């Protein structure tokens, strides 16, 4: 390198040395061009740090001294981008920046190289590329704006610039701190560039001539104002999100704070967002920061707030900024010094750039799109106007909500609650940032506290602000996404639609070409064809000729040399990559391997598979070279070599254990042609359960990106929908359901599904259901698995296309029984997916095909299993039942939607069905399908259902079925409680004629709930009044009930007429002795009320027993005896009442009073001195008002006989105790002071309605409560 001699020359800079030499006589008389050639040759040979010095001299020569040489030597300098030296690669980036600034047209050639360097593996190279892009983005935008006619190359160049800007924004998430810092500065510049300058924007002196959004005309043919404005706002949003990330580092946070301050000063329209971001950060400092870092961040935040406060546009936000500064410990005097004066605000001059912009603006386009106008921001408006447009933020809304709630009481409560969670010692981080609260309790301090709390709540996703924003943005968000996507389509087109270029391709001549229409050509990086050794002044040497030394070789030598040459080229991978000739090497290898034998191909394939990711370019080059050879051969060409290459690659990739990066998919999608054999490899890849999703994603992309053969690829995916492996099949069905939504594929998918469904009408499974390797000549029977194979796809599509249900019904009618059973088992879930309001499903119910009744019924059951039937569904089923198919099974699913009358009419038919079906019917009516009973939706409540069963005509249904049905009711103990059964018995007893199963129900109820004993006694007494003996079956049950309930039933038996009493003894003679003993335990006064005819029957076979004392009173005639009912326990009894019970009479009051008058003249029944005669005044008070029965309290288990007399005081406790013992009832807690009086009764004309007598009956719950006492007394 000629650098001159002497100290004076050595001390000069590289550039000054060079220019001095050039201005002088020159070294060896070299021209500038020759000098450049010489320096480049030196740089190619130098390996130490002096290479940078030489390259910088070249840069000075061709950029500053003689720019005409720039284009000539561009490729040679760019070749150094593959140099292993980091500094050299950084120099190349700097050279690209300077060259493009000198001649912007060079950006067309160099942008792809810069894009490659942006992805360099070295961090410092990437950082240098980001810094260069910060400048070149503005330069490129200005160039595009000035160009009124945009070429295709310019469009592609700008697309790549925009894509690189997007990539740099993504580097905000890089793992390297330095890269993130550089990305923040790039985003800052991007936001400033893609937003308009305003009247009060602060413009740094070095950026005065930089382009901004306001300099871009609205009618530019390619650059769209609105798109750039949206990109600028999106970049700001990304920066704000990055700043509030909880894991942000200290250096990144400091850089972001400065960038936001710069943005606020240069673009005041973003002042609101910046202040809010500062507030959020102040309230939520990242927890990962150390104590010293917290102090540093707070100091930076304070400095930037003060710088923003100086700006005139900060007037609107002075309250928020001041509060933040006070919290950060800023003195009021310092805040006052940094306040903008109102004079500056009023008299702030307009920037020169604004006036220049006015001159530059073109005439407005009268045909401008209204939609674009709506999106245009007002560049000349103030920050206040922009704030009004943007509306309140989440924090503002939440702060307004909290401010009135921050009363002294509420704040005191919050402090007290939070003290529970305070640590024992003050954290160091809190101590470092704590500043005393000034002006506590003032309106300003309360407002600040509300904003602090609102900021934290918003960061946590809480508060009314977040909720309102979500609601307001739901619909606009969808529209915004659509618009943004349409805006970005043009930019991303090249990236998505780029085709892999074929080396030496003749694809434009091939009719078999499958690729999509050619996308916009992207800029390609410069790759020098030869090594940087250039022919210059010293390059004139004798040309080496191969023919001079060529000697004939044997075939074996030739083969060995070929193999050796290929191996050497393969092994030279790293060396070639450092020299920048990697692409040349790939082309050589692809050409060699295509022309030679399979031995070389196996060697190259093995080399590729060793590191597929790094050598994928070689794989594609080889693949496309084979395809190009096939095309070049024309009509006589064969695909065998291409197919062999593709299958080898795919098979090798399939054997690789880890395919997470999707290389297999990339090879399939970018292969020029997918042959049948290759498609079979893809299919096997899909059948691998560990790679199912990736394989089917590949198939999906083939279907959508290669429309010429999409149905062939779709067929493979459809075949997989009936695969025997669950995971493979499920994944295929998911993909197919998404494709079914596409109109162009819908018909094919549907036809395939219906073809498989139609296979079910065959007597045996067709061979298509079996693999090709299985023998299907012998007819195999249908199995559940083969039936399901035909149904999987159809059932997956059914919820999306309800019309398909009619096809299933048609097939079902023709299928064999085994197939029908499987269909019924698998149809449930898809039918539920259709829903009972599906018009097609309702139509199927309405027009139920003959033979599909079971299918329709199953559908109805599936629909109504957990939800009540809809009115429309009930109407269709009702019409079907009444007009076409009177099969009561149709009604079962919609029972809860029918009228009560309809259910009662259908009951005789329903209970004659299979017991399992009957159980289902009762589960629906009682609401017990899923556990606890809930008949709220049933047309019949439990009581009405049981009554309806009793009322079924035995002609319509046999008694055995009715009894089984009632047993099902009694089995539901949770539903048929004692209260329900009491109401049922009361209503059945009131019916005329009495139901045949009445007494059976009474006995079952008493067995289930023994505490109903008292109530049952009342029922039996009422049945005597209804002359139960006239109903033979009921009478037989009556006697059995009396037999089972003795001795409680003795009081009822005594009410029977003599003839019927004798009949009872005839059927149950064992009742006579206990009943006689019971009567003899009465006092004489009580026995006086027993008619002689009754006593005669009682004593008919008991003459040997001592006769009871006759009552002095005259005997009652049989006709005078009226059946009496149990009376409820009276109001508090007199203390001397030894029996503790009262008489309740159901007949006329007048006749009862007459009986009392007959008994009064007798000696025994006459009152004694201590027993006053009964009188109206001595009677208990009127009975309590009739209320609903309450069985929650236990009552006495038995009652006294319906006929009894008063007793004297001195009768003694022993006799009374004996009477209680015989009745198994409790000893009364209080006895009457005088004789027992009779309760007034209503006349027959005012008998209580149905159920009222039950209300008078003692509570069964009360009986159970007093049972222990009764047992103790007995």
UniProtKB/Swiss-Prot annotation:
Membrane-spanning residues where? none
An example Gene Ontology CC term for this record: mRNA cleavage and polyadenylation specificity factor complex
Q: Where is this region: Interaction with HSF1?
A: 1-124
Compositionally biased residues, Polar residues: 380-392
> Where does the source fall among the domains of life?
Eukaryota
Q: How does it sit in the membrane?
A: Peripheral membrane protein
Give the sites of the cross-link named Glycyl lysine isopeptide (Lys-Gly) (interchain with G-Cter in SUMO1).
361, 1239
The HEAT repeats are found at 31-64, 67-101, 104-146, 153-192, 227-266
Instruction: Keywords in alphabetical order, please.
Output: Cell adhesion, Cell junction, Cell membrane, Cytoplasm, Cytoskeleton, Isopeptide bond, Membrane, mRNA processing, Nucleus, Phosphoprotein, Repeat, Tight junction, Ubl conjugation
Question: What spans are recorded as compositionally biased (Pro residues)?
Answer: 1173-1185
Pfam families, per database record: SYMPK_PTA1_N, Symplekin_C
**Tissue-specificity statement:** In testis, expressed in polar epithelia and Sertoli cells but not in vascular endothelia. The protein is detected in stomach, duodenum, pancreas, liver, fetal brain, carcinomas, lens-forming cells, fibroblasts, lymphocytes, lymphoma cells, erythroleukemia cells but not in endothelium of vessels, epidermis, intercalated disks, Purkinje fiber cells of the heart and lymph node.
Question: Glycyl lysine isopeptide (Lys-Gly) (interchain with G-Cter in SUMO2) crosslink - at what positions?
Answer: 361, 483
Subcellular localization, as worded in the UniProt entry: Cytoplasm, Cytoskeleton; Cell junction, Tight junction; Cell membrane; Cell junction
Per its database record, what is this protein's job?
Scaffold protein that functions as a component of a multimolecular complex involved in histone mRNA 3'-end processing. Specific component of the tight junction (TJ) plaque, but might not be an exclusively junctional component. May have a house-keeping rule. Is involved in pre-mRNA polyadenylation. Enhances SSU72 phosphatase activity.
Domain-related comment: The HEAT repeats have been determined based on 3D-structure analysis of the D.melanogaster ortholog and are not detected by sequence-based prediction programs.
Tell me which family the UniProt entry assigns to this protein.
Belongs to the Symplekin family.
Leftover remarks: Could be used as a differentiation marker in the differential diagnosis of tumors.
The record's listing under PANTHER family reads:
SYMPLEKIN, SYMPLEKIN-RELATED
Q: What is this protein called?
A: Symplekin
Q: Which organism is it from?
A: Homo sapiens (Human)
